[in-house]
Regions:
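Primarily ABC-family ATPase nucleotide-binding module
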Residues: 3-14
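ABC transporter nucleotide-binding domain
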Residues: 183-271
Length: 316
């Protein structure tokens, strides 16, 4: 089996297009007229709370479930079973042949995607080495820890060198060292030109690696675009402050939405339109400042504000 040859756009131009994609289960609308354009060579974050519709949208892209309406195109071509083979997919529900040896497992899965056997075996060896699992190559999958099995499935997703990869909660259950290892590998694959859809609820990780994001709430895209533009559209700011003697600021400071204690300092989230410098006179009432630092909004703050606006019926 060979993958179809795609007429790929230049890096940065749209490789995957979703137009008015919808899916309902009875009265529940899992995807509501989803429209997306994902740039080639980017890491594109699918973000949203549990049950928001991220996995449903991914399963529609992978043709695991069929949409009720809308269309999907990959590199300008309708997404079919054949063109879908140009997409690697790591689902949230992991699945490996537990009685197969690690090397045999990866080799077999690469062959299923059209990689010749000799090349498939070489790629499998390289991936096992990259993941620090070379000494486990001849061990059965069921003898590996859960985290090690997850790394095997990660390798299986990339081993056929697909044009696009979809990772659904790839870091779930991993320790910090393995999260860092896979994060670095995701960035390496991006550097090779691979387009990566990164579906997660771990906003701090998305903030580290995503070039662009979409935020899904109730099956609907409520926010999307390059991460820097999204930040610019949400001027929500915070300042980190500390005083000599570590006093506690009052909860009703003018221009402050909420406060949060962090070690010996306080993080103050500002109301929209408030200039951090405007706070200084009120803050200095509590004593000499030892720290005053303005911060850009975090992805978590943007997420919370966007969801709150959507639920109030205010466009983001």
């Amino acid at each position: 089996m060979t993958r179809p040859t795609l007429d790929l756009p230049p890096v940065g131009e749209t490789i995957l297009t979703l137009e008015s994609v919808s899916k309902s289960y009875g009265s529940v609308r899992a995807a509501r007229d989803v429209n997306l354009e994902i740039p080639r060579g980017s890491i594109y974050g699918f973000l949203g709370p549990n049950g928001a519709g991220k996995t449903t949208t991914i399963r529609i892209i992978m043709k695991i479930i069929m949409a009720d309406g809308g269309s999907i195109r990959l590199a300008g071509r309708p997404l079919t079973g054949a063109t879908r083979d140009s997409i690697g997919y790591l689902p949230e529900e992991r699945g490996l042949y537990r009685k197969m040896k690690c090397l045999d497992q990866l080799t077999y899965l690469a062959e299923l995607k059209g990689v010749p056997r000799a090349e498939a075996k070489q790629r499998s060896d390289r991936w096992l080495t990259r993941l620090g699992l070379a000494e486990w190559r001849d061990r059965k999958v069921d003898s590996l820890s859960k985290g090690m099995q997850q790394k095997i499935q990660f390798a299986a997703t990339f081993i056929s060198e697909p044009e696009m990869v979809i990772l659904d909660e790839v870091f779930s259950g991993l320790d910090p060292l393995n999260i860092e290892l896979l994060r670095d590998m995701i960035l390496e694959e991006k550097a090779k030109g691979t387009t990566i859809i990164f579906s997660t609820h771990m906003l701090a990780e998305a903030e580290k690696i995503c070039d662009a994001i979409c935020l899904i709430e109730g099956g609907e895209i409520i926010l999307d675009g390059p991460l820097e533009k999204v930040r610019a559209d949400f001027p929500l700011q915070s300042v980190r402050v500390a005083w000599e003697g570590n006093p506690e600021p009052p909860a009703d400071l003018p221009g402050v939405l909420h406060r949060e204690k962090s070690d010996s300092s306080w993080r103050l989230t500002l109301a929209e339109g408030v200039n951090p410098r405007e706070l200084l006179p009120d803050l200095m009432v509590f004593g000499p400042l030892t720290l005053f630092s303005a911060n850009r909004p975090s992805l978590s703050e943007i997420f919370l504000e966007a969801v709150a606006r959507h639920r109030r019926g205010v466009p983001s």
